[in-house]
């Protein structure tokens, strides 16, 4: 078996571009802002792409403290957390329990909304793709706390590094409100560095203008 290479932001950006996960252009977001790029982690839908993403999460988690359980919010976070658990085991020789939540509670079988590793009394890291408004993360944090977990932190694939409704970004708001660290595999700055290195002047200028208007 070939040992996976360590995660590198540029390699991930190139893979994201090749899969259509990341696009540069003009995109209207739900917020109404016209963004010069769009990121859709749902298109990381093959083994190579998912493996590279999971390697990034796993590498980052080995630098974090208090990793008792890793948790993927339904639905998109479920394959991410499962693949990350595999990467932690195969690459870092760390067997970390993992779990996820259902959108709707079951009243038979396992029951409830939580599936997988027990979280009561555990320090839990949440793994997701992005934090846009922070609503979904807050909901998951509430579910986990109600189950007796301590939230150790959140890992996301992309930090857009842009303000929400106020002066803080959605990630900064979550960090301040919930008093937990939030780490990202790549940031808007990484995207801009990539464009600069590739000589993509028009796309870079659009990113710079957007960051001046909405950046943190």
From Swiss-Prot:
Catalyzes the transfer of a ribosyl phosphate group from 5-phosphoribose 1-diphosphate to orotate, leading to the formation of orotidine monophosphate (OMP). This is Orotate phosphoribosyltransferase. Pathway: Pyrimidine metabolism; UMP biosynthesis via de novo pathway; UMP from orotate: step 1/2. One of its GO terms (cellular component) is cytoplasm. 5-phospho-alpha-D-ribose 1-diphosphate binds at residues 30, 75-76, 102-103, 106, 108, 128-136. Keywords: Glycosyltransferase, Magnesium, Pyrimidine biosynthesis, Transferase. It is an enzyme of class 2 (transferase). Its EC number is 2.4.2.10. InterPro entries: OPRT, Or_phspho_trans_dom, PRibTrfase_dom, PRTase-like. Transmembrane segments: none annotated. Its cofactor is Mg(2+). GO terms for biological process: 'de novo' pyrimidine nucleobase biosynthetic process; 'de novo' UMP biosynthetic process; pyrimidine ribonucleoside biosynthetic process. GO terms for molecular function: magnesium ion binding; orotate phosphoribosyltransferase activity. Belongs to the purine/pyrimidine phosphoribosyltransferase family. PyrE subfamily. The keyword Membrane does not apply. PANTHER family: OROTATE PHOSPHORIBOSYLTRANSFERASE 1-RELATED. It comes from Acinetobacter baumannii (strain ATCC 17978 / DSM 105126 / CIP 53.77 / LMG 1025 / NCDC KC755 / 5377). The keyword Magnesium applies. It catalyses: orotidine 5'-phosphate + diphosphate = orotate + 5-phospho-alpha-D-ribose 1-diphosphate. Orotate binds at residues 38-39, 132, 160. Homodimer.
């Amino acid at each position: 078996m070939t040992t996976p290479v360590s995660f590198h932001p540029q390699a991930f950006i190139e893979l994201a571009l090749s899969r259509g996960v990341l696009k540069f252009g003009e995109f209207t977001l739900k917020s109404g802002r016209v963004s010069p790029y769009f990121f859709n982690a749902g298109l990381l839908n093959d083994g190579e792409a998912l493996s590279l993403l999971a390697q990034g999460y796993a590498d980052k988690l080995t630098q974090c403290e208090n990793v008792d359980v890793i948790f993927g919010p339904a639905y998109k976070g479920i394959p991410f957390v499962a693949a990350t658990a595999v990467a932690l085991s195969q690459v870092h020789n760390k067997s970390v329990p993992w779990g996820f939540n259902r959108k709707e509670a079951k009243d038979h079988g396992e029951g409830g909304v939580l599936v997988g590793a027990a979280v009561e009394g555990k320090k839990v890291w949440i793994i997701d793709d992005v934090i846009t408004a922070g609503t979904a993360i807050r909901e998951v944090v509430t579910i986990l706390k109600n189950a007796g977990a301590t939230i150790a932190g959140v890992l996301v694939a992309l930090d857009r590094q842009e303000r929400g409704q106020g002066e803080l970004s959605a990630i900064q708001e979550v960090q301040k409100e919930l008093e937990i660290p939030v780490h990202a595999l790549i940031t808007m700055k990484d995207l801009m560095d990539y464009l600069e290195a590739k000589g993509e002047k028009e796309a870079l200028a659009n990113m710079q203008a957007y960051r001046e208007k909405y950046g943190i």
